[in-house]
Amino acid sequence: MNPASGLPAVVIDNGTGYTKMGYAGNNDPSFIIPTTIATQSSKGKQTAASQKKGVEDLDFFIGDEAIANSKTYDMTNPVKHGQIENWTHMEQYWEHCVFKYLRCEPEDHYFLLTEPPLNAPENREFTAEIMFETFNVPGLYIAVQAVLALAASWTSKNAEKTLTGTVIDSGDGVTHVIPISEGYVIGSSIKHIPIAGRDISSYVQQIMREREPNIPPAESLEIAKRVKEQYSYVCPDIVKEFGKYDSEPDKWIKTINAQDSVTKKPFSYDVGYERFLGPELFFNPEIASSDYLTPLPKVVDDTIQSCPIDCRRGLYKNIVLSGGSTMFKDFGKRLQRDVKRSVDYRIKRSEELSGGKIKAVPLAVNVISHNMQRYAVWFGGSMLASTPEFYNVCHTKAQYDEIGPSICRFNTVIGGIN
């Protein structure tokens, strides 16, 4: 808690699709809302009152309210592919998060915000300026999302309390594979995958449009999201899975009844192959597009192989899943199996090429799934910000006033306060 006010720190994780916010020490975020803002249309007619200087800056909505007002307001996403792109909208978004949702006085709470890997130092400076000058917070810590996700995995029974591991963070807009050694991100080995939740939704929508003419066009994306979140899973073998559906359609294909939100007429649709074809994009991306062809298990293996040799064993042993797009049933099992195959094949080839002279030590591959996986980044931040040491490593308002925003270019790594 804040040594001065005795109040817990505020933890905000701004993702591409959703923002998670709440107070340190809690297991779950207090609010989860879309990272969307609806501002007054510049083309639309403004009332006489709103034309007064500055009033239009207050006329905006965020989250679900923004979506509800999307017909009369311009709706934008301030965060794209994990990076903040519109700082004016981001400041407005944080304003509503703090005052409307959390209903707190920012002067009384330390703040923990999250950032993607390889975030530009200038972005940290912009964040510091907004937090210290607009909100007048007493202290700020900007944590790397992957490190927080690694800490959150400690809740798993199979996890060791180590800050060495490989984090696969897959949300709505982007998927990162991030190796971490003793709390430090190995930046040169980070890899990005242009496949995430939004791409799976679009692919499922495309399949269902071709097969289900009953689905109203206006409903197709929401139905695709529902299928992705409620019915999808990862299969061990795509060819065998097609055979199961063809031989026993009544067992595997589900019929869903729904209602058109516009006409209120009922309609129904079948959920079939897309149940496993959506998540299959991670393991066989060529089924949707020829633009990107590298499966996730190969990216994970290549990432670890590009790291210093003395930390690779620990990176294979602790592969941690984070984000909503890793929540598919059996996602971890399939990933562990495929990565293990690559590792075992390489070891076998090494022995063959040495003529049997080199006997490699077996390498453990372990993929960690846990209960806090969906909101792992926020939960890791909640754990960190609830420790007394957290307040010792935060950048304070006094330091900011003395030195300036450049103090936030660097943050003490979580490993230093473990």
Swiss-Prot record:
GO terms for cellular component: actin cytoskeleton; Arp2/3 protein complex; cell leading edge; cell pole; cell projection; clathrin-coated pit; cortical actin cytoskeleton; cytosol. Disulfide bonds: none annotated. It is found in: Cytoplasm, Cytoskeleton; Cytoplasm, Cytosol; Cytoplasm, Cell cortex; Cell projection, Pseudopodium. GO terms for biological process: actin filament polymerization; actin nucleation; Arp2/3 complex-mediated actin nucleation; exocytosis; phagocytosis; response to bacterium; response to mercury ion. The modification N-acetylmethionine is found at residue 1. One of its GO terms (molecular function) is actin filament binding. Gene3D superfamilies: 3.30.420.40, Actin, Chain A, domain 4 (3.90.640.10). It comes from the Eukaryota. InterPro entries: Actin, Actin/actin-like_CS, ATPase_NBD. Keywords: Acetylation, Actin-binding, ATP-binding, Cell projection, Cytoplasm, Cytoskeleton, Nucleotide-binding, Stress response. Induction: By starvation. CDD domains: ASKHA_NBD_Arp3-like. Component of the Arp2/3 complex composed of arpB/Arp2, arpC/Arp3, arcA/p41-arc, arcB/p34-arc, arcC/p21-arc, arcD/p20-arc and arcE/p16-arc. Interacts with carmil (via the region between the LRR domain and COOH-terminal proline-rich domain); carmil is required for Arp2/3-dependent actin nucleation. Arp2/3 complex, MyoB, MyoC, and the alpha and beta subunits of capping protein all form a larger complex with carmil. Belongs to the actin family. ARP3 subfamily. Functions as ATP-binding component of the Arp2/3 complex which is involved in regulation of actin polymerization and together with an activating nucleation-promoting factor (NPF) mediates the formation of branched actin networks. Seems to contact the pointed end of the daughter actin filament. The Arp2/3 complex is involved in organizing the actin system in cell motility and chemotaxis, in phagocytosis and macropinocytosis, at late steps of endosome processing, and in mitosis. This is Actin-related protein 3. The lineage of its organism: Eukaryota, Amoebozoa, Evosea, Eumycetozoa, Dictyostelia.
